């Protein structure tokens, strides 16, 4: 069950609080500022993960968020954590504005998961991951594409099933949970639009404005 994730994540709260206290102590010990900043980033990241999983067990509140700013923030975070051989491109700028109802923490997890899947598909080769946004009168479409190895046709109908994974480690919940977040919590759609190793693999998110 997805809700088991909530149970397993709750014990993180206490060690995170402890880490925050230790960080304050280290600040008084004249530890290098760069080290403290990295520790602070990691604690913030753990807090974000805890927040995301705590929302999965109940219907999260959706607030008007600038989609372009959200996507830009995610891209900035991921660019420093993936291979330099991989380029992340987009067809928008953070200065653009498009406000739609979102649970920002859960939505960012979906995009991160799709991008990380693209990174895995590209493997150690040079590659391009694109995040492109288009609009209609009522909907917003977000395409996440890559030029990696693609998904075999025999697997394309089951990729959203719990347990599907191409990794040696992991529970295979990524795409299944992403679909649940988009479709159950945001009332949108997440589909595999196409996958061709000679061209592109494209995942499409459709959200209401």
Feature map (PLM): residue ranges:
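Short beta-strand/loop element within the Bergerat-fold HATPase_c
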Residues: 128-138
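Conserved DHp (HisKA) dimerization/phosphotransfer helix of two-component histidine kinases, i.e.
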Residues: 18, 33-85
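Acidic ATP/Mg2+-coordinating residue in the GHKL
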Residues: 146
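Detector for a conserved hydrophobic position within an alpha-helical segment of the HATPase_c
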Residues: 182-183
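Short conserved segment of the HATPase_c
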Residues: 151-162
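Short alpha-helical Gxxx[C/S/T] motif in the catalytic ATP-binding
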Residues: 5, 174, 178
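Conserved catalytic submotifs in the C-terminal HATPase_c
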Residues: 87-98
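Glycine-rich ATP-binding loops of the HATPase_c
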Residues: 186-195
């Amino acid at each position: 069950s997805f809700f088991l994730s909530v149970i397993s994540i709750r014990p993180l709260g206490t060690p995170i609080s402890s880490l925050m206290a230790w960080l304050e102590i280290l600040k008084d010990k004249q530890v290098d500022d760069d080290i403290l900043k990295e520790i602070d980033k990691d604690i913030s990241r753990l807090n974000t993960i805890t927040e995301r999983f705590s929302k999965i067990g109940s219907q999260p509140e959706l607030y008007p968020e600038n989609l372009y700013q959200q996507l830009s923030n995610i891209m900035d975070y991921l660019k420093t954590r993936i291979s330099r051989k991989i380029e992340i491109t987009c067809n928008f700028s953070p200065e653009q504005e498009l406000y739609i109802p979102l649970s920002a923490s859960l939505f960012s997890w979906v995009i991160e998961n799709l991008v990380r899947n693209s990174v895995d598909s590209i493997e150690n080769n040079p590659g391009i991951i694109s995040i492109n946004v288009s609009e209609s009168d009522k909907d917003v479409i977000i395409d996440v594409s890559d030029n990696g190895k693609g998904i075999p046709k025999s697997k394309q109908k089951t990729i959203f099933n719990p347990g599907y994974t191409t990794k040696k480690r992991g529970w295979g919940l990524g795409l299944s949970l992403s679909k649940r977040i988009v479709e159950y919590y945001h009332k949108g759609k997440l589909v595999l639009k196409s996958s061709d190793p000679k061209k592109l693999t494209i995942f499409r998110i459709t959200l209401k404005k």
